A protein has these predicted regions:
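Bacterial N-terminal signal peptides that target proteins for export
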Residues: 2-17
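Low-complexity, intrinsically disordered or signal/transmembrane-proximal segments
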Residues: 8-9, 29, 33
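Mature catalytic domains of secreted/periplasmic carbohydrate-active enzymes
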Residues: 31-361
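A composition/secondary-structure signal for short, hydrophobic, low-basic-content segments
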Residues: 4-5, 25, 29, 59
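Accessible peptide chain termini
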Residues: 1-2, 310
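Bacterial N-terminal signal peptides
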Residues: 14-26
Length: 361
């Protein structure tokens, strides 16, 4: 058993997944049969906390923020890499990135429509970027003005609108939250093209800011299913800090599930937790699915519909619906979850190509 992962017994498949397994059994190259499971054991409190997630199998990932405005282009030139990394990929200084906030006015955002699209596809939970690596917050935070309520003409708290819409569809609301923060004056390390030494950064102050925002997210928006952390790989973030953050989450909402990116145990993009004393309740393979089942280990593969997470207007490399359904079956048959991403545009619209595939699923 890998450290940081909960031992569990045979999980029941959600009705949607059972239907998919039956419907795809004749497809060529269909997913392998479930791997042998660990022996059944009495439920523990940890198992009870994880039960809904283990039965869910299928969730929606939403990457949305200021990066949807440039949409993969800067100063008239296309920028390589995924859309949400444009500040880093194009080596944009914070002072040049900040004006995007004044342009962010997603008048077509409709929380109910987003939630319905997820529910109609059979998804059981929604994970949205409360804050990505650019530090911009989609919620009204009292600890910064670098957020949608203070820095944009939109002025509305995205999370405050999305959470009740998601719950009204019978799904769990979950937050993605980046530890790495290219914007914050106290975050370290700095980007080489924008060192800003005059700010005299102090990572302990940044850590206090991070914990304060996590407290807001787990206090002001009702019950949260998962805290999905990311950006933990830089050397200023340590395993003791991760344990403290994990404990903070559980102290505010004891039933919340926390992924393994809260600490330092994740082993690259394959996402599973290394041996050792690492915090986190499940592994997070990224853009891949484990080749076999992993008895006794909870995991979730997060994957894109095209080649980017955040909206990128020229990325038209869409996976077929058949491929997406096979991925879902592959994950479910091996005992894992499938977290499928959509990247809304700057007006708040989920791309038609994504909506088409969700309907077809």
């Amino acid at each position: 058993m890998l450290a940081g992962m909960s031992l569990h017994h045979t999980r029941s498949l959600a009705p949607l997944t059972l239907a998919l397994l039956c419907g795809l059994c004749e497809l060529p190259h269909a997913a392998a049969q479930p791997a042998p499971r660990a022996a059944a054991a009495p439920n523990t409190p940890a198992d009870d906390r994880m039960d809904w997630w283990r039965e869910a199998r299928f969730g929606m990932f939403i990457h949305w923020g200021l990066y949807a405005i440039p949409a993969g282009e800067w100063n008239g030139k296309p920028v390589g890499g995924v859309g949400e990394w444009i500040l880093n990929s194009a080596q944009i200084k914070v002072a040049d990135y900040e004006p995007l906030a004044a342009q962010f006015n997603p008048v077509d955002f409709n929380a109910e429509q987003w939630a319905k699209a997820a529910a109609d596809a059979g998804m059981k939970y929604v994970v949205i970027t409360s804050k990505h690596h650019d530090g911009f917050c989609l919620f009204d935070s009292t600890h910064t003005t670098w957020d949608v309520a203070d820095a944009t003409p939109f002025k509305r708290d995205i999370l405050k609108e999305l959470a009740p819409a998601v719950r009204a569809q019978g799904m769990q609301m979950c937050w993605y939250h980046s530890i790495m923060d290219w914007h914050h004056p106290d975050y370290l390390p700095r980007r080489s093209w924008d060192p800003r030494p005059e700010l005299k950064p102090d990572f302990d102050r940044f850590n206090a800011y991070l914990e304060s925002q996590v407290t807001e997210l787990l206090t002001n928006y009702g019950p949260i299913g998962v805290m999905w952390f990311d950006g933990e790989w830089e050397n200023t973030w340590t395993n003791p800090r991760g344990k403290r953050l994990y404990d903070l989450c559980r102290s505010i909402q004891p039933s919340v599930i926390v992924n393994n990116r809260v600490g330092k145990g994740r082993q690259g993009m394959q996402g599973m937790t290394a041996d050792g004393d690492h915090p986190g309740d499940f592994g997070t393979p990224e853009q891949e699915i484990p080749s076999t089942g992993i008895p006794g280990v909870d995991w979730e593969s997060c994957m894109t519909m095209n080649d980017t997470w955040g909206f990128k207007k020229d990325d038209l490399n869409w996976k077929s619906t058949t491929t997406l359904v096979r991925n879902l079956v592959d994950c479910a048959s091996k005992g894992g979850n499938y977290l499928l991403n959509v990247g809304p545009d700057a007006r708040g619209r989920i791309p038609d190509a994504s909506l088409d595939r969700l309907r077809e699923i």
